[in-house]
UniProtKB/Swiss-Prot annotation:
Top-level taxonomy: Bacteria, Pseudomonadati, Pseudomonadota, Gammaproteobacteria, Enterobacterales
Protein name per Swiss-Prot or TrEMBL: dITP/XTP pyrophosphatase
Statement: the UniProt record of this protein carries the keyword Secreted: no
Required cofactor names: Mg(2+)
Subunit organization: Homodimer.
A cellular-component GO term for this protein: cytosol
Keywords from the UniProt entry: Hydrolase, Magnesium, Metal-binding, Nucleotide metabolism, Nucleotide-binding
């Protein structure tokens, strides 16, 4: 059975990855289980950050799959973007980050609240792999005025409103979320690559 390191320490992302990859004959191992420390995400794009995370994890003898994703808000000129997980500072967490977004969006309560969530996935066979497999996914919605009382998600899910669904991402079940989310879209593309990979 093929082994892949999941280059993330985010337990919620690991749950989603394992759920989506369950259809493949792949043994997924989180980097935490191997004692791999997270690497600093100091690049300016999701692609670059995903690449350094994948290269770091793949040093430990197995191919690695990494994710870098975030929230992009039109009226905030793309914020929080690559800083999504640490938008509220060094001691950030989901609640602090959400409150920071809602605070910054207060002046735009009746204006354009369009946003998107974007995910970049990279599969790398070894640290020197010159042809990593890359996939991405984007979902569009709006920033709600308050936090949803129903929260099955994580990150910014509880304030990311989906007009077609008339609910936030956090109100979806895991199965529903995987079908339409930015990460789910990127993973479906990645699975096609992994199924047909010959190198």
């Amino acid at each position: 059975m093929k082994k892949i390191i999941l280059a993330t320490s985010n337990k919620n992302k690991i749950i989603e990855f394992k759920k989506i990859l369950s259809e493949l004959n792949i043994n997924t191992i989180s980097q935490k289980d191997l004692g791999i420390c997270s690497i600093e995400e100091n690049k300016s794009t999701f692609l670059e950050n995903a690449l350094i995370k994948a290269r770091n994890a793949s040093k430990y003898g197995f191919p690695a799959l990494s994710d870098d994703s975030g929230l992009i808000i039109k009226t905030l000129n793309g914020e929080p973007g690559v800083y999504s997980s640490r938008f509220s500072g060094n001691q950030s967490n989901d609640i602090k980050n959400i409150n920071m977004v809602l605070k910054k969006m207060l002046p735009f309560k009746k204006m354009d609240r369009q946003a998107c969530m974007h995910c970049v996935l990279i599969y790398i066979r070894n640290p020197n792999d010159p042809i990593p497999i890359i996939s991405s996914g984007t979902i569009y919605g709006k920033i709600s005025n308050s936090i949803s009382k129903i929260n099955f998600g994580f990150g910014y899910d509880s304030i990311f409103f989906l007009p077609k669904k008339k609910k936030t991402i956090s109100e979806l079940t895991l199965e529903e979320k995987i079908k339409i989310s930015h990460r789910g879209i990127a993973m479906k593309k990645m699975i096609k690559f992994l199924k047909n990979e010959k190198y």
